[in-house]
């Protein structure tokens, strides 16, 4: 088992990474008067009974939500809050978020506002959640106008990453996780980028040593960034590489056509093109990025989107400043910076490279 400490003063916590860690959950809910398990239909059928056995003897309530990004909405937050009140959860209760990024986001946000905050535990079941969304304390839900428009920074009490849970994932969800994994190599660690490229097939085959090393390194990178900037006022912004175009694509497709990781892969590809177009990276490094992205097998053609619609979606991004659209763009291996583009500059790029 590997473990990492996220140092955030009074909000600090441990991340545990390894095989067969789900049964250890019992010790992390010790002292809770009641436990609320929030999960989705797909995860519950594999692990719901196991969780019940693990917390045997304690009062356990379950809420099973539909899988998928549309579940992240204020209506479901209200539903969860009503259940928490109805079941008598107190400030001594604990919430377990068992699922992917969607479950972690909505469970964490609901825990953060119930009675001004009760403890929650992240048990990520997807590769994307294990390498990214379960760490760092970003929680939230979507509005029609955009992704994660309502949310909070609220840290879990512990993150339990059991790599055995990846065995029940469909291949598409492993590809989705690659989006965030590749991102970490590009934004922070050139050597890690090379390691991912060399071991991508072993990762997709769930080779234990490779999976553990990659998950741990992603968590280390995110921990280093979040420890410096918990609430995204500075360096944490680099985690948004691929997410400006990615979020725009998700919004245009109503969060149904692409997984979050797939949208990030598309976003990284086109944002790397912007970086090359502006002279921030050379052709050779762009080809390295393109090669690893193409290994995911994702169709990179997004010319089906109407230019004005894609622009409109990106202008609503909460990261924007002063009427300009915020991008995190590569400047070299393991190095990125924030660049603000006017809608006109972005329209010129998109028209030139996507629509002719």
Curated annotation (Swiss-Prot):
Keyword Aminoacyl-tRNA synthetase carried by entry: no
Cofactor: binding details: Binds 1 divalent metal cation per subunit. Can use either Co(2+) or Zn(2+).
Gene Ontology molecular function: 3-dehydroquinate synthase activity; metal ion binding; nucleotide binding
EC annotation from Swiss-Prot or TrEMBL: 4.2.3.4
Essential cofactor(s): Co(2+); Zn(2+); NAD(+)
SUPFAM superfamilies: Dehydroquinate synthase-like
Binding site residues for NAD(+): 101-105, 125-126, 138, 147
Residues annotated for Zn(2+) binding in this entry: 180, 243, 260
Annotated catalysed reactions: 7-phospho-2-dehydro-3-deoxy-D-arabino-heptonate = 3-dehydroquinate + phosphate
GO cellular component: cytoplasm
Predominant location category: cytoplasm
Entry keyword Amino-acid biosynthesis: yes
Domain of life: Bacteria
Keywords, ordered alphabetically: Amino-acid biosynthesis, Aromatic amino acid biosynthesis, Cobalt, Cytoplasm, Lyase, Metal-binding, NAD, Nucleotide-binding, Zinc
Compartments it resides in: Cytoplasm
Pfam entry (one): DHQS_C
Pathway: Metabolic intermediate biosynthesis; chorismate biosynthesis; chorismate from D-erythrose 4-phosphate and phosphoenolpyruvate: step 2/7
Functional description taken from the UniProt entry: Catalyzes the conversion of 3-deoxy-D-arabino-heptulosonate 7-phosphate (DAHP) to dehydroquinate (DHQ).
The protein's name: 3-dehydroquinate synthase
Native organism: Alkaliphilus metalliredigens (strain QYMF)
Gene that encodes the chain: aroB
